[in-house]
Swiss-Prot record:
One Pfam family from the record: Transketolase_C
Chief location bin: mitochondrion
Keywords noted in UniProt: Metal-binding, Mitochondrion, Oxidoreductase, Potassium, Pyruvate, Thiamine pyrophosphate, Transit peptide
Protein's name in the database: Pyruvate dehydrogenase E1 component subunit beta, mitochondrial
Tagged with keyword Metal-binding: yes
Top-level taxon of origin: Eukaryota
Binding site for thiamine diphosphate: E81
InterPro entries (alphabetical): PDHB_mito-type, THDP-binding, Transketo_C/PFOR_II, Transketolase-like_Pyr-bd, Transketolase_C
Major enzyme class: oxidoreductase
Role: The pyruvate dehydrogenase complex catalyzes the overall conversion of pyruvate to acetyl-CoA and CO(2). It contains multiple copies of three enzymatic components: pyruvate dehydrogenase (E1), dihydrolipoamide acetyltransferase (E2) and lipoamide dehydrogenase (E3).
Length: 352
């Protein structure tokens, strides 16, 4: 990743990878480090949610933060998403910068009024007088064997709403840099993590370990350069896309993989530049197909000069249009894989 230094602040640029892989870091540790650094940096920042303090969080994302920063900065709440989300929004109105953790974004539906009607609308309805600097974060999408009510992907839901920023990290670099940017942002940010990615380790450069490392919201990253097809994805879909790119390389297909990182604002320019080079486009997401992120990409392609650059129709790889089954074999059948991505690319390129 190319970087520029603004004063003491390291800011990640659009494309590429870290300058040097100094070590590895899990997504869990990256999120923990980001919150630790921002709580220390700004005394207006605090974390609240179910079991985030003494228990260290349901997924141990906040491990050690309560002991280090105390119960005014890391706050356990009752099991009432509507209640503690409302408290968090009110705190943001008052000038604090809360991080509101949902144990799973499936439960954010209990707090949807606070997110959509209070957090997302207040800056507009106050004519810019009342900013709402809040981060709603937690695991989103399919996990492992948690069935229909705990496996939903809300990316497209929240990206549909003006007034929100929506971020979907893939790697440890994404997780740390984007969460720090979200906490510093004066707008409400929905920060959609993935439970399966929490324990995965990624190489990180020296700059990622800096207290001042941030990744700009709204800028995609070219995870892998290629010439024959553009594969666009986010969150765990990037994993499938990169694995597919490796398989395609073995048959002589050079795939460019774009990690969107942010869904709103949306970096369509990176897609445009890539398709002008490859002339083929495949989108990958784990959520449902109807009105999904791939659908929005397709619409923007149709409405721009990118459409004239395509040598084949855009193809979408998505989850299956059903509630998530509980049975392991059926759950696997409901989610996209690298093989699905390879199949879509071959269809786009008209190769066997």
């Amino acid at each position: 990743m190319a970087l520029r230094k603004c004063g003491n602040l390291f800011v990640a640029r659009l494309a590429g990878t870290s300058t040097r892989a100094a070590s590895t870091m899990t997504v869990r540790d990256a999120l923990n480090q980001a919150m630790d650094e921002e709580i220390k940096r700004d005394d207006r920042v605090f974390l609240m949610g179910e079991e985030v303090a003494q228990y260290d969080g349901a997924y141990k994302i906040s491990k050690g933060l309560w002991k280090k920063h105390g119960d005014k900065r890391v706050v356990d709440t009752p099991i009432t998403e509507m209640g503690f989300a409302g408290i968090a929004v009110g705190a943001a109105f008052a000038g604090l910068r809360p991080i509101c953790e949902f144990m799973t974004f499936n439960f954010s539906m209990q707090a949807i009024d606070q997110i959509i009607n209070s957090a997302a609308k207040t800056y507009y309805m106050s004519a810019g007088r009342v900013p709402v600097p809040i981060v709603f974060r937690g695991p989103n999408g399919a996990a492992a064997g948690v069935a229909a009510q705990h496996s939903q992907d809300f990316s497209a839901w929240y990206a549909h709403c003006p007034g929100l920023k929506v971020v979907c990290p893939y790697s440890a670099e994404d997780a740390k840099g984007l969460l720090k940017a979200a906490i510093r942002d004066d707008n409400p940010v929905v920060f959609l993590e993935n439970e399966i990615l929490y324990g995965q380790s990624f190489p990180v450069g020296d700059e990622v370990l800096s207290d001042d490392f941030v990744v700009p919201i709204g800028k995609a990253k070219i995870e892998r350069a290629g010439d024959h097809v553009t594969i666009v994805s986010y969150s765990r879909g990037v994993e499938f896309s990169l694995e597919a790119a490796k398989q395609l390389e073995a048959i002589g297909v050079s795939a460019e993989v774009i990690n969107l990182r942010s869904l709103r604002p949306f970096d369509f320019e990176s897609i445009r530049q890539s398709v002008h080079k490859t002339h083929h486009l495949v989108s990958v997401e784990t959520g449902w197909p109807f009105a999904g992120i791939g659908s929005e990409i397709a619409a923007q392609v149709m409405e721009s000069d990118v459409f004239d650059q395509l040598d084949a129709p855009l193809l979408r790889v998505t989850g299956v249009d059903v509630p998530m089954p509980y049975t392991q074999t059926l759950e696997a059948a409901a989610l996209p894989t690298a093989e699905h991505v390879v199949k879509a690319v071959k269809k786009s390129l008209n190769i066997a």
